[in-house]
Regions:
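Mid-chain, structured segments of secreted extracytoplasmic proteins
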Residues: 67-104
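C-terminal partner/receptor-binding element of secreted or periplasmic proteins
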Residues: 101-138
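Sec-dependent signal peptide recognition
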Residues: 2-8
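Bacterial Sec signal peptide processing site at the extreme N-terminus
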Residues: 10-31
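Sequence contexts marking disulfide-bonded cysteines in secreted/extracellular proteins
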Residues: 17, 43-45, 122-124
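Extracellular/mature segments of secreted proteins
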Residues: 24-25, 52-54, 129-136
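Post-signal-peptide N-terminal segment of Sec-exported extracytoplasmic proteins
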Residues: 31-73, 84-86
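Processing junctions and N-termini across compartments
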Residues: 10, 38, 98-100, 117
Length: 138
């Protein structure tokens, strides 16, 4: 019985520490660094993507340490999920910057990839911290 508890605890702890890198195989299609926090950027992208007119269902997940976020696009319930590609955006917070990686399946929807990456760029500009803002004299 103790053995099962130890094995179960080890499995639970290893799952909590695992990142999102193993969800879609292969190298990212695109990777870019942005001077913003991952939580803010991923939330902005998720909300904007939900507002798109598309047959995709968008979801947002956070890692247990809140340093990695994942926004996925999959086929909605109305459409067979196997007929639509899957797209993943991985947001990796590194200090005050975030690396964004985009992966999609082999049958990728290039229009979706372009639209979603445009949202990432737009959101990065919206949530970026102003660099060396100077006070305005009265």
């Amino acid at each position: 019985m103790k053995r099962l508890v130890v094995i179960g605890l080890a499995c639970l702890l290893s799952a909590c520490q695992s990142g999102f890198a193993d969800l879609l195989p292969g190298q990212p299609e695109k990777t870019t660094d942005y001077p913003t926090m991952g939580a803010d950027l991923s939330d902005c992208v998720y909300r904007a993507a939900q507002g798109m007119r598309s047959p995709y269902l968008f979801r947002r997940k956070a890692s247990t340490n809140n340093l990695e976020f994942l926004v996925t696009a999959t086929g909605s319930n109305a459409v067979k999920p196997s007929t639509l590609p899957k797209l993943e955006l991985r947001f990796i917070t590194q200090g005050e910057a975030t690396t964004v990686e985009m992966r999609d399946t082999a049958i990728g929807d290039h229009e979706l990839s372009h639209d979603v990456w445009s949202i990432v760029d737009r959101c990065a500009q919206q949530v970026a911290k102003p660099s060396a803002a100077k006070p305005i004299a009265p």
